[in-house]
Design a protein with these regions (language model features):
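Short solvent-exposed coil/turn linkers within tandem alpha-helical repeat scaffolds
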Residues: 6, 47-55, 69, 84-91, ...
Length: 187
């Protein structure tokens, strides 16, 4: 396995690094599809090197490219293929990206579910089980979707949970969360 898998992973990682340069420059079409000469795009890396860590990341990047190109169905397709790891930043953000993509394809319940999942994933890697930077933002997005669905009582509970759980977050410290609580109470 080592003799076959290792070179394949290395080739995939090299291709991924080159495509990432286009992504970092926000040249999303070339990052996604390659440049026709030296760079293989994320979509091809994901299919050609399926089963590798690089292909997994290529699915994430391809989904993000499609999101930036406002091709939301394709964004969902690739983001769903990404398998999150147990890390504090990339995986929660990837799950959040999928949640936001679901908003754009009008699957709001799925969006809320994935945003909550992203917050939980970030909290799992946070200090004392709390991530005061990512999780409150993800939960706020979820609560706003719930509120937009006319479920003010449920949204109010979510806003209050944010205020209680993420006391050290900017959202709570700045008292911005209170505006959301008041708005939901007024409905």
């Amino acid at each position: 396995k080592y003799f076959i898998g290792q070179p394949r992973e290395e080739k995939a990682s090299t291709a991924l690094a080159m495509a990432t340069q286009y992504f970092d420059q926000e040249i999303f079409d070339k990052a996604l599809n390659g440049d026709g000469s030296t760079t293989t795009g994320f979509a091809r890396i994901a299919s050609d090197y399926s089963g590798t860590d690089a292909a997994n990341l290529a699915n994430l990047y391809a989904g993000l490219c499609y999101a930036n190109l406002n091709k939301w169905d394709k964004a969902v397709e690739y983001l769903e293929k990404y398998s999150p790891a147990d890390d504090a930043l990339v995986s929660p953000a990837a799950v959040e990206a999928l949640g936001n993509a679901y908003v754009h394809v009008n699957q709001l319940d799925k969006a809320v579910s994935y945003l909550k999942k992203a917050a939980k994933k970030a909290d799992a890697e946070g200090h004392n089980g709390v991530n005061n930077s990512l999780s409150p933002v993800f939960m706020l997005q979820a609560a706003e979707i719930v509120e937009s669905q006319g479920k003010a009582d449920e949204a109010l509970e979510m806003y209050k949970d944010i205020k209680e759980k993420y006391v050290a977050s900017q959202l709570v410290q700045s008292q911005e969360i209170d505006k959301y609580i008041e708005r939901a109470q007024d409905k």
